[in-house]
Amino acid sequence: ALRRRLSGSPSLPTNDREFRATLEPWLDALPANLSSGHAFHWLPGTQRPWHDAGIDLVAGDSVTVLADGRVFLSRPLDIWVGPSFQLWCRIGEEEPVFRGTRATQTFAARQYGRLWLASYFPGEWADASGRLGTPPQEYAKVSGGLSVLVLRWNLGTDVHSLFRDLAKDTRVPGLVLAEAERIDDPVPTPEHWEYLWTLGAGEIYRPSLTRDGRPAICCHTHGDVGILRREARLPLVPGTRLAWSWRVDE
């Protein structure tokens, strides 16, 4: 079930005009040799996937996506989804869908293709290429939307070093600082495990150790959702019993 404030962001989002006004001066100040193009997009919550980002990528292109906004299931009850879960991407028509773990993300294209964006909830994916498994009319039940900036860096740009340098200037927009922090301090997924693709990547689970030094997985979630999985080569036969326990600290 959708949980209250799924995005985990307690602050109020900017509107689309404020979003652009905050980021445009920063974009104008970037050296011309760094970026090969950018575009702003507004994704209304009522728009079913997919939205054409208008950018054709080639293998090796680095792209940064910054987003803000909320898609509401119920405004009176303050039930909404933020960009960390709501904003999905796809390169080309048939490649696997993916999302970031926060309201900001940077990724490298693995193949040529047009970049597409999607406001996901209340939909569910029918397959990994982003075909919907829910009726289109479900999108009429939500409101709000997402403001998105897509920025493509020139080939050869060291994006990690670039954001590290950008973070030294506290005058840059908050979303830029947030992406610098995410790049500089990523949350690793436990080795041999992966997030279930239908819900997307996350920062919920991380490798850890028990008090006596045994390998463990730490689970910490706030306004997020995700399922971790791995292959278990165990034959399921009559009599096979699976058991597990949960611990929740507040």
PLM region spans:
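Gly-Asp-aromatic-enriched flexible segments
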Residues: 2-212, 216-250
